[in-house]
Design a protein with these regions (language model features):
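Conserved alpha/beta catalytic core and glycan-binding cleft of carbohydrate-active enzymes
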Residues: 132, 136-137, 229-234, 238-311
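Conserved residues at the C-terminal ends of beta-strands
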Residues: 77, 96, 207-209
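Catalytic metal-binding/acid-base residues of hydrolase active sites
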Residues: 125-126, 209-212, 246
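Active-site clefts of carbohydrate-active enzymes
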Residues: 207-214, 307-311
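Substrate-binding/active-site clefts of carbohydrate-active enzymes
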Residues: 6-8, 12-72, 79-198, 228-234, ...
Length: 311
């Protein structure tokens, strides 16, 4: 498969490169306009609202750079419209954010990347949408809406469950067969749309895959990965599916679901222990991996043990 041994380069569109076309786009009210070389707000208020204006055309203009440094896969963080610079709070899954150049810009980027021998992957939040999403707005405070069972609403659809309690990220309820139909199941779904012509993405990375479909007594976690994979195999048999997991994901890569994972802990936890200095109050020591420093040889041993869990 083309993904074996590939070098994946992740791009956060707002930060990577800005084309001249971006100068003519009107910013939404939530955006804090920043000049390209301005200092970045590292944390706190304004972090998700600072807007530098990178776009898909800007990425297209720098594909030769990706080739030069050895990348073979371009992975785009979400390109759907949202209420933040990261766009993990999608307001629609049916269009590319006009601030990035719209649908035509994605089509052009993928075509140009393919011509240069690069694959292109997108990023989907199957765990949640944004609170400005068309489905959520249709159902909020409206229990009779067809989209009402797309989310975990309570109290006349005035309250709802969200990702880590963040109100702007309402959590999907995968009990809903209509949600499955619109989003992940079949050739008319969101998953399928962007893999097919005229866009031709080569695969998806599923955000917080470890939490998707899982809340209280509901656990559709493994099933949702299988449904997404089935749709992808149906519409684009050569496509590739990656899931984001913060813990052990070995049972999700057994052939019927994710083909690869972002399992940060396999790398970060041994590294944190290697870097740990008991004389300093470092954040790395607060994550439950122990505060005993280890040698480089032990780092490699731990990493191999984690990696060996996967088939």
């Amino acid at each position: 498969r083309w993904a074996s041994g590939a070098v994946l380069y992740q791009v956060f569109p707002d930060r990577f490169a800005r084309s001249q076309e971006a100068d003519n786009r009107k910013l939404p009210e939530w955006a804090i306009a920043k000049s390209w070389d301005a200092e970045v707000i590292g944390k706190g208020p304004g972090t998700a609202e600072q807007f530098f204006g990178g776009d898909l055309k800007g990425i297209e203009e720098h594909l030769d750079h990706l080739k030069k440094i050895g990348a073979t896969i371009l992975y785009l963080t979400p390109f759907f419209p949202g209420g933040s610079n990261h766009r993990y709070d999608a307001s629609s899954f049916n269009e590319v954010d006009p601030l990035l150049g719209g649908n035509a810009a994605l089509k052009s980027l993928v075509e140009r990347a393919h011509a240069k021998g690069l694959r292109v992957m997108g990023d989907l939040t199957a765990n949640h949408s944004g609170d400005k999403h068309e489905w959520f707005l249709a159902a909020y405070k409206n229990p009779k809406a067809p989209e009402s069972d797309f989310y975990y609403f309570q109290d006349g659809n005035k309250k709802y469950d969200s990702w880590w309690g963040v109100p702007s990220l309402p959590k999907f309820n995968w009990n809903s067969q209509e949600l499955r139909k619109r989003f992940i199941l079949g050739k008319s779904s969101v998953v399928a749309k962007w893999l097919k012509s005229p866009y031709g993405l080569d695969g998806w990375r599923i955000d917080v895959a470890n939490m998707t479909g899982w809340i209280r007594e509901d656990n559709f976690n493994r099933e949702i990965g299988q449904v997404i994979r089935g749709t992808m195999d149906d519409v684009a048999p050569d496509s590739f599916l990656i899931g984001e997991f913060t813990s052990d994901a070995a049972n999700h890569v057994e052939g019927d679901s994710y083909q690869s994972t972002m399992t940060y802990s396999n790398f970060t936890r041994p590294v944190w222990r290697w870097l740990w200095n008991p004389k300093e109050k470092r954040e790395e020591g607060q994550v439950g991996v122990g505060r005993k420093g280890i040698a480089a040889s032990e780092l490699m041993q731990l990493h191999k043990q984690f990696a060996g869990i996967f088939p």
